[in-house]
UniProtKB/Swiss-Prot annotation:
Residues 467-666, 721-912 form the MAGE domain. The lineage of its organism: Eukaryota, Metazoa, Chordata, Craniata, Vertebrata. It comes from the Eukaryota. Residues 719-933 are annotated as: Interaction with DTNA. The keyword tRNA-binding does not apply. GO terms for cellular component: dendrite; nucleus; perinuclear region of cytoplasm; plasma membrane; postsynaptic membrane. May enhance ubiquitin ligase activity of RING-type zinc finger-containing E3 ubiquitin-protein ligases. Proposed to act through recruitment and/or stabilization of the Ubl-conjugating enzyme (E2) at the E3:substrate complex. This is Melanoma-associated antigen E1. It comes from Rattus norvegicus (Rat). Keywords: Cell membrane, Cytoplasm, Membrane, Nucleus, Repeat, Tumor antigen, Ubl conjugation pathway. InterPro entries: MAGE, MAGE_WH1, MAGE_WH2, MHD_dom. PROSITE patterns: MAGE. The gene is Magee1. GO terms for biological process: negative regulation of transcription by RNA polymerase II.
Amino acid sequence: MSLVSQNSRRRRGGRANGRKNSGKGRPAAVPGPAVPRDRSDPQILQGLGATEGPGTSVLPTPRGGSSTSVPPTASEGSSAPGQLITSEGRNTSQLPTSRKGRGTRRPPAVSAGLNAAASITASEGASTPVLPTAPKGSKASEHLTISEGASISEQPQSHEGPNVQPTLGEGSGTSVPPTFSEESGISEPLPSGEGLSISVSPTISEGAGINEPSPASKAPSTSVPPTASNGLGINLPPTSSEGLSISVLFSASEESDISVPPPSAEGLSTSMPPPSGEVQSTWVPPIILEGCSVKVRSTSRKGRRTPVRSAACESPSPSAECLSTSLSSISAEGFCSSLAPCAEGSDTCELLPCGEGPSTSGLHDLEEESSISQMPLAAEGPSASGSSIEDENPEEALSCGASVGMNLCKCTSLALQKADDPSVRPKRAEGFLDFQVLRDSENSNSITIMGLGTAHVALTLKPQDPMEQNVAELLQFLLLKDQTKYPIKESEMREFIVQEYRNQFPEILRRAAAHLECIFRFELKELDPEEHTYILLNKLGPVPFEGLEDIPNGPKMGLLMMILGQIFLNGNQAREADIWEMLWRFGVQRERRLSVFGNPKRLLSVEFVWQRYLDYRPITDCVPVEYEFYWGPRSHVETTKMKILKFMARIYNKDPMDWPAQYNEALEEEAERDVPNNWRAVPHFRRPLFQEVSPELLASDSDAPGCPSKYSPHSWPESRLESKSRKLVQLFLLMDSTKLPIPKKGILYYIGRECSKVFPDLLNRAARTLNHVYGTELVVLDPRNHSYTLYNRREMEDMEEIMDSPNRPGNNFLMQVLSFIFIMGNHARESAVWAFLRGLGVQNGRKHVITCRYLSQRYIDSLRVPDSDPVQYDFVWGPRARLETSKMKALRYVARIHRKEPQDWPDQYREALEDEANRAEAGRRPLVVRNLR
């Protein structure tokens, strides 16, 4: 007889026995005391329904062997939730027939499709549905196996109290799920202790699988997650405590859909139809506890698992975005799981994102005192979820350092990812959630917050209760969100607080603000009371925009300051057309995308508006519609009108008092800022990006001694000077991407040879624009050839070596070539440099290309060796190399490669120290462009 026929006969026999033993002689279709009338009836059960009374429901007993597995029984007052175990490929259940192997109990049925078996776990608590079992000596099991399809085996449940007295021990039951292996499965149930039900997770292996539960005792219970191996897989869970339920289930199907709903109200069992979709789906009805109602919605898509979310009436459940403490969750690349702290009477549900590959998440009961429900949210690959049941009094805190049956690292890293479905997980801002919350596995109360943005921050807290854990999570979110310069919404902050503590949000926010003030010197300020948005401010006072100019955002901040200045000079409002006309004078075109700003139009009308630096309002009664720019609330908080006025005065080479109305308004604003709080601004602790150059030094070359000029720079009209300087700025920005020096002849050829009369004045105008707007300095690279280049002093000071870029091929060789020249005595023969590059693995034709490029970019210069025949050349450092790096950096680079200290080269180290001293002295002098003739 084929396996399919045997399975079909067992299934028909099981249904017949269920109808025979259900009710007191009534047909199953006739409504009775134990038969539900509609789907809302609390007595709806999935599988076989057992009625109230002493009736016994016995599962069909296969004929082929001497012993089978006994489904788990529950002691008096125990509750049992249903769980699913799904595998792909061969499935071996505990059926009586034994064909081969050593003393094993193995089923004869092996299917080629998806097989699922439902196991029941019991825990001490209120009376809930209990699986009816056969009397002592009888052994029954129901496993429906369907070839090339999904197979579901479900145990019947009763409604009120147990219908069958326990037969194994005193009120105990042991359920051994099948062991999944490609060859054979061996499962041996062992005697159990008192009031205990153990559900053992399957072992995944390519060889033989052995699953042996340990004898139950009164010791604390633990759960052993499934293990994966290439050989023999053995899964031995430790002993369990009295009345404690341990359940871990595993799903190993690529496209199967498994959802385990959380527990809800007592005595209520609801069976829900399986979700529809393109793939096989398996469903387990929720076991409802006291005080909650469950709304189940699930959808199924091909290749994805959709979790079931619960809506509790009295006990809310936090969603996946709540940062709960992280313990263990096995994904395709590592281990990470999660436990959420529970308050009294609450039921916690958490969604965990899972990567590709087998993934497991397990939860544990906390000695009759906690209620936790966990559901996985899988991406592509098998997933598993475990659930636990609340007993009496939940603990207020969980130990986040304990490992759950697996070896974890010293610290577990939790990274939040964006939700794929906004209906399942709350929507949050994109692109800023790169951070780590590090927890010490030995000290469960130690949390270290690390920011991974441009501003690295670290904070170690040791919260003693869940309140402090929520404070730590909120603090990390505030620090990372502030780096984006977008206002922080109160609704976003609430998402990072566990749901049962959201009613204490004001206290959590107050504690987080205290940490920000004491540790990071930031003030949490409410930006808009109506929208409940906040920003972080430096406690040292309103921050000038120079202090906010980080390396990537420096040019954008300079552009923003010009816009704010134009708005202020125009009467605190400015039309969009006037703003673009002003920016056009400085080389910023509306439709032209520059690498510095990206899309200027989007930067002004979208990014600065979202960051609340600007307000963008339409003008009423205007056809077609025009817009005006105003100062945004963030600009009023972070800067002052006097600072913006001084900034505009530097750009136009004027004095702030040249605008008397705006100067008086700025003075009044400063007085208003000082009087209410009797507060004076303290200079910002960061070094400003640009050195302020005195007007005497910025004067034209005609005023400079030693540089006479017979042409007056003021002989040209102002509009023509602005037009030529704007064209010059565009030339420098375009040539800066190539890193090639710009000679004076090339500049005059581009802007016109007639500009040689006013060249110094044009150069100084362009230098001021490049300095204040774009954050770069225009410097003389070679005084003899009158070549110029752009230089970012702050960027080069922070860099240990010259960074790589698409326009600088082989920069990894550049630092090595410069270091080689320095070690060789500040000059090296061309043949020696090529031999050095050949030793680094550079191809023959590539060496000449690299050195020629470095020569053209003025990183190295070539000097002819006197009296050499044939002619030979020495390579020395060029002016750009001396500008962008230093001898000390080159020496440190060599020492790092050779794993030595810079002092190991004493002569070069002494020379590098002298070079550093000379650079420090030269850095105190302002860098001014001169027209050297």
